Amino acid sequence: MNDSLQAIPNQPFSFFTQASCSHTQARAGQFFTPHGVVETPRFMPVGTLANIKTVTPEQLRGTGAQMILANTYHLHLQPGEGIVAAAGGLHRFMGWTGPILTDSGGFQVFSLSELRSIAEAGVTFRSPRDGEEIYLSPEKAIAIQNQLGADVIMAFDECAPYPADRSTVTEAVERTTRWLERCCKAHDRVEDQALFGIIQGGTYGDLRQQSARSLVEFDLPGYAIGGVSVGEPPELIEKIVKFTTPLLPEHKPRYLMGVGTYREMVQAIAAGIDLFDCVIPTRLARHGNALVRGERWNLKNSRFREDFQPLDQSCACYTCQNFSRAYLSHLLRARELLAYTLLSIHNITELISFTQKIRQAILHDRFSSEFASWLTSPSPS
């Protein structure tokens, strides 16, 4: 099958599977949004505060990025959803014309375990910025996201920690379902914003199944698997994803939250996942690390001081086309800010290109052979 676009549907949001792997559950698809088409499987860069750290929107477009993320919790704290709305919405505010997804802020709130209190109505917590008391409920999370104006918004959920006992996870699953119902009732921009539900359940298979069954009944435009990559070993993440993904509708996009390593993405794509996000490419860049063909290189290492090759001769990114490993090593040693921009551009391009290669392999039914080493290699310790 070729990679050409299908006819744009009448509905503002729809998902089509173009091809499937004959040996795994991997699939190549297209997710239509009001701000463009997302070709899946796809890695999505994270721009927590309405920017991809050190990278301009123009530079970001050059990486092949299609959909990006911003964070409701952080944008509520600074600058505030009212300012974003007054600017014309998130797209205009940050100068990004493609699709945007906003997380509900639930994960960030629940990570503030010492600063919060949970009740059925919502969560009260103290801002880590200034100690101010803040209240966030399903209704408020949706109202904030409605004002921000992203294409895809996430339901407010309760993310149980890892490890957690069964009763704690059960309570989180049941509350997540009740909160989703409230999110649906509060959501008043259904024509131009797709609300995704988030499957919880921790490491308990039956609770994952319970969560998926309950949330699928809401018939939402898409679903995410949450509560993973929160401290579990890699093999447990793979087990959860492999078990949970088939429980989600085939005709809806499936999003695995907070995952973005090579191996984890390949394994998840084989299970049927379409979308990924992670801060890895920019975070590694800020620490002087480059992602190169499945490896992680520390450019501060002395072996790069007189290495005048590009990071990756096969990479088409701006960094690899114009600069050497030695130059990047020099910038890092001199603590020049340009180093972080150039490495971020490359790392984002690398992960997007990686998922694009997987997509092409699926379209031509070569996924299981071309990515066999990633599918069969043992989990890292």
Swiss-Prot record:
Pathway: tRNA modification; tRNA-queuosine biosynthesis. GO terms for biological process: queuosine biosynthetic process; tRNA wobble guanine modification; tRNA-guanine transglycosylation. The active site is at D103, D277. Zn(2+) binds at C315, C317, C320, H346. It is an enzyme of class 2 (transferase). It catalyses: 7-aminomethyl-7-carbaguanine + guanosine(34) in tRNA = 7-aminomethyl-7-carbaguanosine(34) in tRNA + guanine. GO terms for cellular component: cytosol. GO terms for molecular function: metal ion binding; tRNA-guanosine(34) queuine transglycosylase activity. Pfam families: TGT. This is Queuine tRNA-ribosyltransferase.
